[in-house]
Amino acid sequence: MLSEQGLLSDCGNNYFQMTSCILSGSIQTTPQVSAGGSEAKPLIFTFVPTVRRLPTHTQLADTSKFLVKIPEESSDKSPETVNRSKSNDYLTLNAGSQQERDQAKLTCPSEVSGTILQEREFEANKLQGMQQSDLFKAEYVLIVDSEGEDEAASRKVEQGPPGGIGTAAVRPKSLAISSSLVSDVVRPKTQGTDLKTSSHPEMLHGMAPQQKHGQLTSSPTTSEQLACKPPAFSFVSPTNPNTPPDPVNLEGASVLEEFHTRRLDVGGAVVEESATYFQTTAHSTPFSASKGTSSTLLFPHSTQLSGSNLPSSTAADPKPGLTSEVLKKTTLTSHVLSHGESPRTSSSPPSSSASLKSNSASYIPVRIVTHSLSPSPKPFTSSFHGSSSTICSQMSSSGNLSKSGVKSPVPSRLALLTAILKSNPSHQRPFSPASCPTFSLNSPASSTLTLDQKEKQTPPTPKKSLSSCSLRAGSPDQGELQVSELTQQSFHLPVFTKSTPLSQAPSLSPTKQASSSLASMNVERTPSPTLKSNTMLSLLQTSTSSSVGLPPVPPSSSLSSLKSKQDGDLRGPENPRNIHTYPSTLASSALSSLSPPINQRATFSSSEKCFHPSPALSSLINRSKRASSQLSGQELNPSALPSLPVSSADFASLPNLRSSSLPHANLPTLVPQLSPSALHPHCGSGTLPSRLGKSESTTPNHRSPVSTPSLPISLTRTEELISPCALSMSTGPENKKSKQYKTKSSYKAFAAIPTNTLLLEQKALDEPAKTESVSKDNTLEPPVELYFPAQLRQQTEELCATIDKVLQDSLSMHSSDSPSRSPKTLLGSDTVKTPTTLPRAAGRETKYANLSSPSSTVSESQLTKPGVIRPVPVKSRILLKKEEEVYEPNPFSKYLEDNSDLFSEQDVTVPPKPVSLHPLYQTKLYPPAKSLLHPQTLSHADCLAPGPFSHLSFSLSDEQENSHTLLSHNACNKLSHPMVAIPEHEALDSKEQ
């Protein structure tokens, strides 16, 4: 499991790595989190998102086993595997057996990716069995090279299952290792590792740079190292042996910004992990060159720290062990919240891993945005705030987020949020991210993470959750805590993971665009179990992803940064900035989260504040909103409002997010959470930009509100709390959107049923009372990413409905005209009645249907929506005119009343009139006038041949004949065609035609 998770971690983020670890732990500790309810056991994840500089090596080690156990078994694997995976980056041979053993997946980023995936799944099961500790770092590290960021993200998304595998494929070593790392971290002794991670975060940061040096290979290793061994080892382990900086690493760049700083401190690569920082770090540290070196260095460090753990593993192996050890140490020492810290560290390592990967593959930005990939329809507890974040990050990274972006996903999506919006549009979808929405860059990481999670977690989309969590943990302490918790929660609520991706993911179905896509993929890969739990979370996550996605987790940040660069357009500079900030927050969050719910709350507040600022976040928030809409079941909206007040800094969306989140947790509990959520929103937006400062300031506020709900919520709830923060962000937009939907609801009423359904869902979101149930439904509903597409669809439908309305109105006017004409017409009251009833009842289409040809009616109706109605009506009108001509003579007769004789003698009188009116149709008129039957036929032909007066001539002939059939036809025609009546009308017709 650990290795599995480690892999995810690696892929996702060093930060996430830690989270992943926690997540893994959650999986193992089914008891802790029942929300996810993995197949065997509900993954119980106590996510302690640790935001720290991404360690070059993120090592996931079971707290107990660390790296010591090389066996594929979850515990053993995680530390050793993580290290090894990272090592494997540069030293695939390790991957051979050790990799499989440790991380089977991590070791061979590319080759082993599949293996890792399998192992991961296997491990996930094992892990569940192991259930080392509640705490698992569910850190999602998405490592993408600055240039290949999106690409990597995409790959990751595709390969998301393996977690690192996707990236591994792209940057096999880096991604795989990253994944491993993350997995390991997650899996590691989630608790021990987490603790270490806490301390480790800074170290991790240091490691991250090293990792970057190690590039793909190094990255995972570093990540692993960081995650596992977090403390100094991480830093030293990382690519930069020169930065042995346990201190530096520990210090890391305080989070991304901080993280960045931490990362930079550690090895530049660390910073790069944030995206920008990662890049910088990567650049700073010879990432590509040191790819192998990085791994090696990391390993050496790892060896130092955990040499005992896996000396044979090679430097890499030992390194992981060391990393685990260090991580523990660091976590404990570095962060008081060792719990939160360790997740954070875990996260960090993944981030680092991501960084490394980024470097090697140009993965510089390992930005893990929690995309709420809400890929899984299953209700996830919003609590997977972090997941959401991750998804978002993914989306953001991929640009899916840019939706957000699932789809994002939300995202998502919503390409992350169509795929990722659906997953994506991730997704995600899109996330879409979302992102994930949505969110592709992150998406891959998220994907990877999710994969790890998934496999470990069995439940679908645990990764996403992880990612989200990681992202969530944007605040150094709080952020991390959140991420961790979220991650754990994600794992706990596999559904949540599924939910995402946006965002993120993201979510997956729709989830944030890119993110969602990735997230969705992840979710899909993840077993349904996770989906159930995570779906709701996912939705929330997606929201979070959107809102938090940007910066959510340090890793997320890294990715975000990277993505920022790539998706800078999308997210804008803020995203990178956010990302930078976020890592710190994440670390804090992780620490807080791990430590206690209260910490988490504090983290939330920090994150929230941090989250608040980023415009990119705003984007995400919008996505989140959508995600929330999906979550709409959640009664967060009202809560969100309260939340909003709490986090005045946070966007209104934050409150919304919060509200989304709340529903996830329990409404009662969630409400308290809401406040925290409001605070937490910083995770999404503010987190990245001013994650640290804000997170600190927010922490106090957040803590008090969150603490109460958090505790009630339980581990899962705690995560949920975090999630709510992310959700609150996304909810805000959602609320806005909900309002919009409500505004549009009138139109929607006329829209197709699907639109109505969406409306109902949105309403549910708006109504907190309904939110809870709806949130469950939302789980089933498409992620945010889907929502985006859904929104588009709804808008289109609404537009069509409006058009139809207008057309109907015009038709009704025509109908009234027809009736008017009917009376005017000499035809009997029967005829008049018929036209009136038919047109009114059926409307234009019905009129046409009443006409001899239903096909024309159908075509007309079809055309009506497009606005092609006129062309069709022209044909219909022609037919109508023919038939109407029969009774039209009456209107003409009025005009021709002067010549009643002429009227009788249609041939003589009518021709002149028609001639005057329509010279072209004179000839046509003549034949109809001459013989009723023939004229009728002719009139039909005439009708076929467009002629406004065709019907006139026909009407004259009909009138002469007084054929009941013709009259009936005329009545029908009249009904269908308003133009039948008067010369004026005819003029109109001619104009129309």
Curated annotation (Swiss-Prot):
The modification Phosphoserine is found at residues 146, 818. Predominantly expressed in the heart and skeletal muscle. Also detected in liver. GO terms for cellular component: cytosol; nuclear envelope; nuclear lumen; nucleus; PML body; sarcolemma. Keywords: Cell membrane, Cytoplasm, Disease variant, Membrane, Nucleus, Phosphoprotein. Its main location: nucleus. Residues 1-51 are annotated as: Interaction with LMNA. Residues 564-574 have a biased composition (Basic and acidic residues). It is found in: Nucleus; Nucleus envelope; Nucleus, PML body; Cytoplasm, Cytosol. GO terms for molecular function: lamin binding; transcription corepressor activity. Residues 80-90, 212-225, 300-315, 500-532, 695-711, 849-864 have a biased composition (Polar residues). Residues 161-837 are annotated as: Required for interaction with ISL1. It is a peripheral membrane protein. GO terms for biological process: negative regulation of cardiac muscle hypertrophy; negative regulation of cardiac muscle hypertrophy in response to stress; negative regulation of transcription by RNA polymerase II; positive regulation of transcription by RNA polymerase II; transcription by RNA polymerase II. Residues 343-358, 533-563, 811-822 have a biased composition (Low complexity). InterPro entries: MLIP. It comes from the Eukaryota. Residues 71-90, 152-171, 186-225, 231-250, 300-322, 334-358, 443-481, 500-582, 677-711, 811-864 are annotated as: Disordered. PANTHER family: MUSCULAR LMNA-INTERACTING PROTEIN (PTHR31514:SF1), MUSCULAR LMNA-INTERACTING PROTEIN MLIP (PTHR31514). It is linked to Myopathy with myalgia, increased serum creatine kinase, and with or without episodic rhabdomyolysis 1: An autosomal recessive muscular disorder characterized by mild muscle weakness, early fatigue after mild to moderate physical exertion, exercise-induced muscle pain, variable susceptibility to episodes of rhabdomyolysis, and elevated serum creatine kinase levels. Rarely, affected individuals may demonstrate cardiac involvement, including left ventricular dysfunction or rhythm abnormalities. Required for myoblast differentiation into myotubes, possibly acting as a transcriptional regulator of the myogenic program. Required for cardiac adaptation to stress through integrated regulation of the AKT/mTOR pathways and FOXO1. Regulates cardiac homeostasis and plays a role in the protection against cardiac hypertrophy. Binds chromatin. May act as a transcriptional cofactor for ISL1, repressing its transcriptional activity. May also repress MYOCD transcriptional activity. It is uncertain whether Met-1 or Met-18 is the initiator. Directly interacts with LMNA. Interacts with ISL1 (via N-terminal domain); the interaction represses ISL1 transactivator activity. Interactions of ISL1 with MLIP1 and GCN5/KAT2A may be mutually exclusive. This is Muscular LMNA-interacting protein.
